[in-house]
């Protein structure tokens, strides 16, 4: 986790995102919405298409 303090003294927290290849998504990933929906069924909060081969990766906070 990265914590930043700006000039005004407020604190900003940025969480890292971990990616895991979807176990249920089949074929090339052409729709971010379809990928995210499959990731939801796997218990992840989000998912997106990534990489040269356009695979579906599920995202979660590390």
UniProtKB/Swiss-Prot annotation:
Cell location: Secreted
Signal peptide: 1-15
Keyword S-adenosyl-L-methionine among record annotations: no
PROSITE patterns: GAMMA_THIONIN
UniProt entry tagged with the keyword Hydrolase: no
Keywords per UniProt: Antimicrobial, Disulfide bond, Fungicide, Plant defense, Secreted, Signal
Biological processes per GO annotation: defense response; defense response to fungus; killing of cells of another organism
Superkingdom of the organism of origin: Eukaryota
SMART domains tied to this protein: Knot1 (SM00505)
Pfam families (alphabetical): Gamma-thionin (PF00304)
Gene3D superfamilies documented for this protein: Knottin, scorpion toxin-like
InterPro entries: Defensin_plant (IPR008176), Scorpion_toxin-like (IPR003614), Scorpion_toxin-like_sf (IPR036574)
Disulfide bond positions: 18-62, 29-49, 35-56, 39-58
Any one GO CC term of the record: plant-type cell wall
PANTHER family in the cross-refs: DEFENSIN-LIKE PROTEIN 1, DEFENSIN-LIKE PROTEIN 2-RELATED
Family: Belongs to the DEFL family.
Name of this chain's protein: Putative defensin-like protein 3
UniProt organism field: Arabidopsis thaliana (Mouse-ear cress)
